[in-house]
């Protein structure tokens, strides 16, 4: 606009000043080696104005051309972006429908032209993995890494998840370790870490992140309690298998107080000690639990079960403690505590006392365990009450036969139903 105004003003000045200098304008002489050019000043001014007009027109044409090129480029780019967005949405729908091959094609085809190319490549990798194409999944992840960088949290989470789906536990373990260094409190990272550590039985690593898992809110109280129990029991097995009983007990004594005071975990430790024939240590821990529980706290069924397995050289202290509790036990605990007491009497060959407590055990038919009747008949026989032993043995056989009769009856009912259905289909 300014240039056009400049040209118009120049022409206007020429038109106004022309008559005043008419006849006095003189001339201009331009001399070169081979040529001489002479013209009036007016002609020179007109030539200068025309030259400027040509230059300005050329500049305008070039600018216009480049503007058209940029507009064309933007138009094609917008078209590709809109197409990529449309294909991404269609691909996500196909992914939800389970058509992973179509989803991968739609999401990954124009991924680089989408609004978030890294997300598209990650989703394409997940779709490829779902249909079992590990090569394509890894290729998409490599492209996503090139775009986002090697330390991108989103890409690394997707890589770890896909490694887990490929069942490459060592690689997934290494990847999740790196993720925990990048984002230790990230919920998705913690969720992956829990799953990978459980599947790879890396209980020590899982134990280190339990506090963060508890604070993350990933699990409710019951689920987290179950996770902690699995972790701690896994640690017991790990230490027992790697370092033996001595290493297990040394590790146990080094644990924090809240863990050593965990009754359920201590019962699990007793079970492992008995499995390894360390009945003395198991008896000592059992005695500690009973002393800590006191007289008014009920004994759990798992603890009673482990007491029946104990075979220490001297069980007198434990026996006195359980005898004291058995005198004031309620009906719910009657069967459990008498069973434990009876087995301790049997270990000491005190069959008369064992017979008395086993009478209390078989008086609770709803709480009987599989071997209770067999053990009771053995005790009664050793105590000299052969009639009662035979009666209990007959009841045991009847219960076994009753259980065996239930299975054929259910099988016959199914056979009759199938045959009836077959006859109906033939009649049709």
From Swiss-Prot:
Ranges where the record places region Disordered: 408-428
Is Magnesium found in the keyword set? no
Q: What is its main location?
A: membrane
Q: In which pathway does it act?
A: Porphyrin-containing compound metabolism; protoheme biosynthesis
Q: Name one Pfam family in it.
A: HemY_N
| Gene Ontology biological-process annotations | heme metabolic process; porphyrin-containing compound biosynthetic process
Q: Where in the cell is it found?
A: Cell inner membrane
TM region(s), chain numbering: 4-24, 36-56
Membrane topology listed for this record: Multi-pass membrane protein
Read off the NCBIfam families from this record: TPR_hemY_coli
Tell me what this protein is called.
Answer: Protein HemY homolog
Write down the species: Haemophilus influenzae (strain ATCC 51907 / DSM 11121 / KW20 / Rd)
